[in-house]
Amino acid sequence: MKNIKDICLVVAARLGSHRVPQKMIAPFANTTLLDIAMKKLIGSKVVPKENIILAAHEPQLIDIGEKYGISVYRRSGESSRSEGKELTVLYDWHDKLDFKYVVLLNPCLPFLSIEIIDEFFLAYANSKDNGLFGVIAKKNYFWNSEGDLITKWVDGLEIMN
C-alpha cells in the first residue's frame, strides 16, 4: 500500500509532435486536448489537486495548466523536442519531483473518463508493486502475405468489431 500523498499524476505535454504538430492546443471539440485533460483531473475524487503536475516547456501549455490551478514543472526545451531515444531526456522531471511515485497520464486520450483515471490511481496506490500498466482487451485481425485472414473470425459477426 502506498500513501496517496506520495503519488503524483504527471501530464507530459509538448507542441513539437512530428505526426500532429501542436496537437495539445489544436481545436478539438470546441476546446483542446490539454484543456480536456486538465478539466477532468481537477474533477478527480481521488487525486489531490496538489498532486497533479503538468510537465511542459512551451508558454501556451504552461498557461493552460495555470488556468486550472495545476502545478507546472517546466521541462527543458531539449525534453520537449525529444522523440524518446533517451528516456532521461524525455522524462527530465523523473528525479526532480517531491513524490516517491508517479502515475503518467497521456493527454491524447480525450475519451478516458475521470472514473477510470481514479480507479487506476487507487489500484496503483493499493498495490504492493512499484509499477502498473493500464491495458484494454482488443480484438485485432491479421492477414498473411497472400491476403488470407489468419485470425479466427468471431462467430455471428458480419463486420469487424
For the regions a protein language model found, what residue spans apply to each?
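Hydrophobic targeting segments
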Residues: 6-11, 34, 41, 51-54
